[in-house]
Each structure stands twice: as structure tokens, then as C-alpha cells.
């Protein structure tokens, strides 16, 4: 974090060339401490949406670079992708700037304010599993990503058994699909 060291892999095939940046880091939880490269790490940073007042929703390179530089100026070191995976270019920038990322699936407020059991009524799990798999597959090689967030503020209070049956397999899926043992889940 803060001062990343990235390597560049170069692949040539005939006249074609492809360059890919990559880095190494370790992540672990020891007791109550979150460690990156063996050192305690304290998450300081915002949740944000990919939008701006003057450009609208979606990825915008100028807005993103400006925002990330402002976060550095504020002494932030982490960014939660709320509440969906961002454009891949954002992860590339976070890799280069040493900003730690909590990657999140687009599962916001499942069941919040509903009278029926959302985990039994709506066919969400198949879609949610597919989105989680796609996010992990796409972002697993970004050294900036240190946590997978399965969702935002789900209602687990009103239907606890259904919620457990819904979230447990997704949590296990995130564990199975981690290609390296140094990624954590939220």
C-alpha cells in the first residue's frame, strides 16, 4: 500500500506485443489485526460510486484519476467499490497508486423493508453466484484487491435461517474461487 512496486510482463507473438503490469503482496488476519506484507494495515478511505455531477454515471478516466489523487491528498489508503465491481481501469490505477480495494458484488439491501422472505421468494442466488464468480475471475490478479465483499446491508435479521442458507454458499464459493491463499472475504 502507498508505494507499490509493479513488474511488467511482456508477451510477444510474431509482431504483436502485450504488456501486463502485476505485483506481489501478502494478506492475512492475525488475531484482530489485518496485515498486508506482514505489517498492520488500517483501512482509511471512502466508498464511492462511478459517477460525477457533470459527466453522469459510469467510468470516466479524468474524474477517476482526480478522485484517487484527492483520496491520496486526504491520506486515504483504501477504497470500497460500492456497490458493484468498477471498470477494470480503476483497479489498474489503484494497483499503480497503491490504494487497497474492497471489491463488492452488486447485492444491495437484499430484503430490506420487505414483508416476504426475499431469500425464498426471488431467484437471486443463481444470479448472485454468477456475478461473484465473474468478479473474482476478473479481479483476482489485481494486487490492490484484498477483500471480496459479498453484498451491502442485507436483511439477515427478519429471516435468519433463509439468510444463512443464502449467504453461506456464496461465502464458501468465494473461498473456493480464491486462487491464492492471501485474499480475505468480507
Labelled PLM ranges:
Residues 115-124, 151-173:
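Active-site cleft segment of glycoside hydrolase catalytic domains centered on the general acid/base Glu
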Residues 124-142:
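An active-site-proximal structural segment forming one wall of the substrate-binding cleft
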Residues 176-186:
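Single conserved hydrophobic/aromatic residue that forms the stacking wall/gate
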Residues 85-87, 107-109, 152-156:
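Solvent-exposed loop/turn segments at secondary-structure junctions
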Residues 27-29, 154, 181:
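Hydrophobic pocket-lining residues within nucleotide cofactor-binding pockets
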Residues 50-55, 110-115, 154-158:
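A short acidic, helix-capping loop that chelates divalent metal ions and anchors anionic groups
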Residues 1-88, 93-101, 131, 141, ...:
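Secreted/periplasmic carbohydrate-active enzymes, especially glycoside hydrolases
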Amino acid at each position: 500500500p502507498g508505494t507499490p512496486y509493479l513488474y511488467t510482463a511482456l508477451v510477444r507473438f510474431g509482431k504483436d506485443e502485450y504488456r501486463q503490469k502485476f505485483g506481489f503482496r501478502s494478506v492475512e488476519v492475525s488475531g484482530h489485526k489485518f496485515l498486508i506484507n506482514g505489517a498492520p494495515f488500517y483501512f482509511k478511505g471512502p466508498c464511492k460510486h462511478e459517477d460525477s455531477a457533470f459527466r453522469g454515471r459510469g467510468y470516466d478516466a479524468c474524474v477517476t484519476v482526480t478522485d484517487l489523487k484527492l483520496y491520496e491528498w486526504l491520506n486515504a489508503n483504501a477504497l470500497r467499490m460500492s456497490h458493484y465491481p468498477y471498470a477494470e481501469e480503476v483497479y489498474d490505477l489503484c494497483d499503480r497508486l497503491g490504494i487497497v480495494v474492497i471489491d463488492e458484488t452488486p447485492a444491495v439491501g437484499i430484503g430490506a423493508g420487505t414483508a416476504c422472505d426475499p431469500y425464498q421468494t426471488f431467484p437471486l442466488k443463481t444470479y448472485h453466484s454468477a456475478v461473484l464468480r465473474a468478479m473474482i475471475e476478473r479481479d483476482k490478479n489485481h494486487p490492490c484487491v484484498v477483500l471480496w465483499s459479498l453484498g451491502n446491508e442485507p436483511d439477515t435479521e427478519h429471516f435468519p435461517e433463509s439468510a444463512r442458507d443464502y449467504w453461506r454458499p456464496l461465502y464458501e464459493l468465494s473461498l473456493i474461487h480464491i486462487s491464492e491463499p492471501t485474499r480475505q472475504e468480507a
